[in-house]
Amino acid sequence: MSVKKASFPELFDLVVVGAGHAGCEAAMASARLGLKTLLLTINADRIGHLSCNPAIGGLAKGHMVKEIDALGGMMGLWADEAGIQFRLLNTSKGPAVHSTRAQIDRDAYMKAVQRDVFRQDNLWVWQDTAENVLVENGRAAGVSTLLGQEFRSRAVCVTAGTFMSGLIHVGLTHFSGGRLGDPAAQGLSASLRAVGLELGRLKTGTTPRLLRDSINFDVMVEQPGDNPPRPFSFRSRHARMPQVPCYLTWTNEATHEAIRAGFDRSPMFTGIISGTGARYCPSIEDKIARFPDKDRHQIFIEPEGLHSPEVYPGGIPTSLPLDVQKAMIATIPGLEKAQIVRPGYAIEYDYANPTQLKPTLETKVLPGLWMAGQVNGTSGYEEAAAQGLWAALNIFCGLRGLPAFIPGRDEAYMAVLVDDLVTKGTLEPYRMFTSRAEHRLLLRENNADSRLTPAGRSLGLVDDAQWQLYTAKKTALEQLLAELDARQVRPDAATRDIFVHMNEAVPTRSVSLADLLRRPALGITDLQAFGLETDGFAADVLEEAQTIVKYSGYLKRQEELVLRTARHESVVISEAADYAAVHGLTREAVEKLSKVRPRTLGQAARISGITPAALSCIEVYLKKNGWL
């Protein structure tokens, strides 16, 4: 039911704390599903802000944007509206790992997010700082704020990003902040500890921003986008904004010398920073220290927007002193006269190790309290948005008495993300890669809709327009696959000439178009020579049909593997299980199982140190207690 926004309700269904990518995705989904939702933010002017690089997508990340979209989420639509360059990455490899990445106009993206957030029925916004999670009768019951407000709710979702006790470092100068220009949330960490959560400390960083007009692009390598650009959303026909290039330059030995000269004033090397940094997004000073033999590092000059005076030099995040940053920049080809508009900096912040969460992202220690996004130890906009949507769907299911939304690792990258987090935890910022998904052949960007849109529809987040697009594509794909299987090509004189012209062996018997498509050198459009009409099919339908046919053998083996492992995934472990009472388990196994409290035997198997023998012991215990 839609509720127009008048005065604030006395009782919200959900309070979302933080309006970054996790918070906006969670709040929009919750409100669209009919839950009365409050989005609480430290700065309403920065709702949906891209705090680091002006880009969305990338390897495995593009898959998650597509999955968010397939479920009815928003990130793909917002990215398509603000995208100023789109590229499909990994095209030299198989289609399973092709990933979309878009440069984003930072202001246009934020405006799109804020427009939808402020217009959305059932969704209220309040600028303030969350100080405490309210608890009543052993459940989260709302939040209180720095301004003394209390917002009562049936559920709370903390999506605080880097804001919990955030500490910013530029050289040996450090000060409180959630990001440069915004205050930190100082009280929330203590409140979360008070309800029983254990918090750790992580670190991330960003690059200095440069004045566009002070850069010499002529000595750099231009990096154009794809033409035509391919949007993220299954609901988008095309990109909306003019497309612009990026540029590539490199560091050199003079750059590295300038950086080394500042090591003695680096907060990372002097021990001032205690938080663990991102392994896969290291600072430039870390790269120089760890790889002294490498004579240069790439720097991608990324536009901040069509009309922005700033650019983002991707590849040189740093927390070195400002004078060192200036000296470093001045040695880079094309940046000799570049002016720094904003310094690069590192930020430390509190996070909750996600083994303290259920697979729904609800905390184990306090019912009604959910956590999503960077506060769970992840890095990246896309990982955050995926968690925000996941949490919102499960909050909706919980409040409505529906089964939890927990797809398997063979169904979604976001499922791999959440399962890794709640099962293994993380002591460093977690980033998604295609290599983390053991069933990645089944998890292609192009089939995200067939994997997840029916689930989004059944939950109520996929609207009629999106459902019609999905069913039309599904019908067209089924029609095309049927035609490829049914239509036969005979080795007669006419077809023989076609095969010879294509440099292909002539078959000795009649073969289907699908059989021909399995030949490595032939693509689906080549089959037009044999009478296949492709003009009536959209490009994504043709591409998906080609993938399904060409990789049918591999896909079948992958599906068989999923079936073989499905038995463990279907064995649910009772919440009442006492691992100390399981005969045959080692002390290590008891400790890890008691901490994670896996939902299924399959999840238990993915905990480090849990052997097949331990799984057998658990299964015997479950049967003995009548839980199997």
Curated annotation (Swiss-Prot):
Alphabetic keyword roster: Cytoplasm, FAD, Flavoprotein, NAD, tRNA processing
A family per Pfam: SAM_GIDA_C
Cofactor: FAD
Entry binding sites for FAD: 18-23
PROSITE patterns for this protein: GIDA_1
Disulfide bonds: none
One GO cellular component term: cytosol
Annotated binding of NAD(+), by residue: 277-291
Keyword hit for Signal: no
Coiled coil: none
GO biological process, one term: tRNA wobble uridine modification
Subcellular location(s) per record: Cytoplasm
Predominant place of localization: cytoplasm
InterPro entries in the record: FAD/NAD-bd_sf (IPR036188), GIDA_C_N (IPR049312), MnmG (IPR004416), MnmG-rel (IPR002218), MnmG-rel_CS (IPR020595), MnmG_C (IPR026904), MnmG_C_subdom (IPR047001), MnmG_C_subdom_sf (IPR044920)
Single annotated GO MF: flavin adenine dinucleotide binding
NCBIfam families the UniProt entry points to: mnmG_gidA
Family: Belongs to the MnmG family.
Subunit structure as annotated in this protein's UniProt entry: Homodimer. Heterotetramer of two MnmE and two MnmG subunits.
Reported function: NAD-binding protein involved in the addition of a carboxymethylaminomethyl (cmnm) group at the wobble position (U34) of certain tRNAs, forming tRNA-cmnm(5)s(2)U34.
Protein name: tRNA uridine 5-carboxymethylaminomethyl modification enzyme MnmG
Lineage: Bacteria, Pseudomonadati, Thermodesulfobacteriota, Desulfovibrionia, Desulfovibrionales
